UniProtKB/Swiss-Prot annotation:
UniProt-listed NCBIfam families: YbgI_SA1388
Name the record gives this protein: NIF3-like protein 1
SUPFAM superfamilies assigned: NIF3 (NGG1p interacting factor 3)-like (SSF102705)
Gene that this polypeptide is encoded by: nif3
Family from the record: Belongs to the GTP cyclohydrolase I type 2/NIF3 family.
Superkingdom in the source lineage: Eukaryota
Length: 354
């Protein structure tokens, strides 16, 4: 990697961020991407990217003092729509001040949770390492990826009437061949190609027995999606080992733990996890342990009554250390050392144990 810090145009920064963290993975309710855009952001020379989990007013001033030219705030500082722009609300003051100082603000939020190599992968990989690397993880709710070829067509042929070279050529020009034999052809196409193919198939109807179309607009992703379900191989590990590992990963002194109400002590083989507020995600999978930033009182009671452990760490404690551990080096590599990446020193969880 080059050690020379130079600059990158704003347009390229936005493009590369979108490639690293695809925004289409964000939850529908979320507010992600470029949230504050000073004029001519595309042509700006971005020299210093400032990372924070929460963009508070003191953290924004820290970014200004650090001469940041671009802010990535994991949590979106702007969420609700507003009809006026004034100094009455914190979020609007942050937006105004960032524009006055010509600093764009970008938030990846739930897209970073769900992407391959994102926040939940960071946590699941650390848990698997506690078991000597023996285990695997998958999304609790896999992302449904759109396909370029949205239609699959199967054509069943009379074995004694092979298709002519001209017909095969026309099929190939208007679709993607997936399978071909003397009695069957499988191909895929997009919606625009479909009508052309239907008319083409009708033109050689004497050569075929029948044909069908399957809509395949969505496919489940193997790596992208909400939360992670971790399965540990062999006998699993003790809850105390996981508690220690979680504290070290999140760089915190304390976690809160709920134990099975039966008093039963058991090894942990399955862990359902989600950074932040994961109550709507983690309980979609049955697990020995539920790990997240925050849960409601009754959700914890219910899980413990069903014989599971629960670990909650406070919301942003389960997210913050991803920035220096993973995102900072990833961005330095992404921009080949041409941008200096700074992590906030003031950003911290608002709740403290005393």
């Amino acid at each position: 990697m080059s050690s020379t810090t130079n600059s990158v145009k704003g347009k390229e920064v936005l493009k590369k961020l979108g490639e690293l963290i695809p925004l289409n993975l964000a939850e529908k309710w979320d507010n992600v991407g470029l949230l504050v855009e000073p004029s001519n952001t595309d042509s700006m020379d971005i020299e210093r990217i400032f990372l924070t989990n929460d963009l508070t007013e003191p953290v924004l001033q820290e970014a200004i003092n650090e001469k940041a030219s671009f802010i990535i705030s994991y949590h979106p500082p702007l969420f609700n729509q507003f009809k006026t722009v004034n100094q009455k609300s914190i979020s609007q003051r942050i937006a105004i001040k960032s524009i006055e100082n010509r600093i764009p603000i970008y938030s990846p939020h739930s897209a970073l949770d769900s992407c391959d190599g994102g926040l939940n992968d960071w946590i699941s990989n650390a848990l698997i390492k506690l078991n000597s690397g023996k285990g695997r993880s998958k999304p609790i709710t896999p992302y449904q990826e759109s396909l370029k070829s949205t239609q699959k067509i199967s054509i069943y042929l009379h074995t004694n009437q092979p298709l002519t070279a001209e017909i095969l050529k026309q099929l190939e020009l208007n679709s993607n061949f997936q399978f071909y034999s003397t009695d069957k052809i499988e191909l895929s196409c997009d919606q625009q190609q479909l009508l052309i193919l239907i008319n083409l198939i009708k033109s050689f109807s004497n050569e075929i027995k029948n044909w069908d179309i399957i809509n395949q607009e969505k496919v489940l992703s193997l790596n992208n999606g909400s939360g992670k379900l971790v399965t540990l191989d062999d006998d699993g590990i003790d809850i105390d080992v996981i508690v220690k590992g979680v504290k070290e990963l999140f760089n915190i002194e304390y976690v809160r733990i709920g134990r099975p109400l039966s008093g039963e002590s058991k090894k942990i083989k399955t862990i359902s996890l989600c950074a932040g507020s994961g109550g709507s995600v983690v309980f979609n999978a049955k697990a020995d342990l539920y790990l997240t930033g925050e849960l409601t009182h009754h959700a914890i009671l219910d899980a413990c009554a069903k014989g599971s452990y629960v670990i909650v760490c406070d919301h942003s404690n389960s997210e913050r250390d991803y920035l220096p551990q993973i995102l900072k080096p990833n961005l330095e590599k992404l921009f080949n050392g041409r941008i200096k990446v700074i992590v906030s020193k003031l950003d911290t969880d608002p709740l403290k144990v005393i």
